Amino acid sequence: MLISSIYTICLFIITSVLAIPPKEGSDSDPAKQYLVTDLPGLHENIDDDFKPIMYAGQVELFPENNTMYFFWKFTDPKKSTDSAYSKRSIFWLNGGPGCSSMDGALLETGPFRINQDEKVVMNNGSWHKAGDVVYVDQPAGTGFSYTDQGKWLHDLPDMAFYFLKFMEKYYEIYPEEIDNDIYFAGESYAGQYIPYIADAILKRNAKLEEGQKKYNLKSLLIGNGWVSPNEQSLSYLPFFIENKLIDKENPRWMELLGDHEKCQRIVDGIDSKFDDKELNPAELDSNLCEGILTKLLSATVNGDGADDDQRCINMYDFTLRDSWPGCGINWPFELKYVTPFLRNDEVKHDLNLRVMKTWRECSGRVGRNFNAQHSFPSVHLLPDLLKQVPIILFSGMNDIICNSKGTLQYVLKLNWNGRKGFENPDAKLDWIHDDKKVGYVIQERNLTFIDIYNSSHMVPYDLPEVSRALLEIATNNYDIRDVDETNQNLVTYPLGVQKKGKIEVNPPSTPSSNDDSTTSETSDSQPDTVSSAGTSAEAETETEAEPTVNKVARLIQLAVILIVIWGLYLLYASWRARPSPIMKKNGGNGRKKNVQWADQLSRFEEEADASQLKGFFAKTMDRFRTTEGQGSYARAQSDDYIDDIELGEGIGETQLDDFIIGSDDEREGELEQPTHKSGNMDTDTNKNMKNSSNESKNKNTV
């Protein structure tokens, strides 16, 4: 009977372990181990038709230094297999350097925003409806990405090498996506990242090794990009003047004008040696030019009784105000919800973190180390990239730090595809989206410049649906509409609507001969709307796979229940069958008898009474607890033993939450030079504009 009981217990344990529903994908499919099935607010705030399929986790790149990149991927389960969106992968990067792309996921282009209850709510302008979007925390150490101390990256080519390693690992997890069209999008210092990554991809494609597949790079979208640092900084004073933020009556006007002239001389020196193959030291030192913005913000502080949060111009949206010396670091205000959301242990578990580090919007340690002192600014890469890849440079018109004026300045100096700058920069097309004028466009020779009205440094934060239409421009899904003999509009449509071909407001009596040439192959078909019923193969696969998994799990669970019942029955039968006579025979000698003392008889009676009060389960557990060979007199556990159990529990409660050392090195809470990151200042290194003279040694980051 004892052997039977042990067998039953072992079988019960093994079967129970097998019956624990695994995280979907812990089988042979590597993708499923990254599946995200729950988040705070997901099931109560997000409509079923809108819920994306999500994958997230830390992918190991280099085991020797524990480098892992965190990604969060969103895909639309309702997309049609014949839709252009079904074979599109969009990699989104935020800036810094050292600022997390979770800003993009939860404040800009992702399907969710975070509310004051720290739960997800819907973002109706999510880009995942136009293609799979993958948000990546990089370089190593940014956001939820991780690396060993002292293994920080320093230069742009190294960053690109690491990112291609991430792509290699990513396509090992999702091999079915390797033939997808690839788009890179991002903002701020991503204006340095994206061109370098694109250049590395094109070089890889040109020298494929055996077994490698080409990456189908289709387009780059750079928003308010930090592409040509000194040229961008040269635009600050003209921008302030143009928008009536400062005038010649300001007490610091002459000081500001002097710095602007010095910056102009630096830029002139850079331009004279732009085509040199050697790095220009003047181009690597942008402290003087960048310092102009710090002085402009200081010179325009409102001290005449203004509220504390209204004293300084917001450098990311000049129509807004902030406290001094923040000048924008407290914006967007939803960041105060995003930070605790991503620091929630439950959320970290939902996102499949292997290293439970504390999330920071921007890492000062990463930013300080990534100084790019051996890298050409990415503006030098644009001419060669434009030979092969279309590039969109879009700007929120209200941004100061990476404003559209600075972008146009470096574009007009750039030589690409046989000519310099835009031949006719005044030939602007009004951008009409969903029958509203949202900006203007200049297009020539694979380069598109877009200035977007009523938007900030973070265009998708302000205008999510308009920002999503940038992908329609990137994929040529737009119409050119004649307004009159000299003016035209660029027209995009709501999600899922295909372009109609060339439309004229006052068409002639006979159709234009070139109408057909502007119509896409899909324009003759009915508008391709996203079906709410969902007809994609991926959605069908998910729908069909889940019931199968559930059925298997239920069968295993049923088997476990039957085995448990059987085991309990055997244990109960064993308990009922134990010898009960007062005089017990000794198994070793049939003639000798073991006499029970009177106090023992009383104890047996008390136990019998107690056992009658216990239920079936309690009796069974008593059977488990009975010590073999000691009967009712099994030795009680000592106090020392109990203390050991408590000590063991205490030791087991380890904390692995924060792999970023909270030391002076992080300098969290310190304010420095204004930063060029996506949507905020580098909260660890660049928050003190009052000490700009000393802190200007640190690179102002986007």
UniProtKB/Swiss-Prot annotation:
One of its GO terms (cellular component) is membrane. The keyword Repeat does not apply. Gene3D superfamilies: alpha/beta hydrolase. PROSITE patterns: CARBOXYPEPT_SER_HIS. It is an enzyme of class 3 (hydrolase). It is a single-pass type I membrane protein. It comes from the Eukaryota. The keyword Transmembrane helix applies. It holds the Pfam family Peptidase_S10. Residues 501-547, 663-702 are annotated as: Disordered. Glycans are attached at residues 65, 124, 446, 454. Keywords: Apoptosis, Carboxypeptidase, Glycoprotein, Golgi apparatus, Hydrolase, Membrane, Protease, Signal, Transmembrane, Transmembrane helix. GO terms for biological process: apoptotic process; proteolysis. Protease with a carboxypeptidase B-like function involved in the C-terminal processing of the lysine and arginine residues from protein precursors. Promotes cell fusion and is involved in the programmed cell death. This is Pheromone-processing carboxypeptidase KEX1.
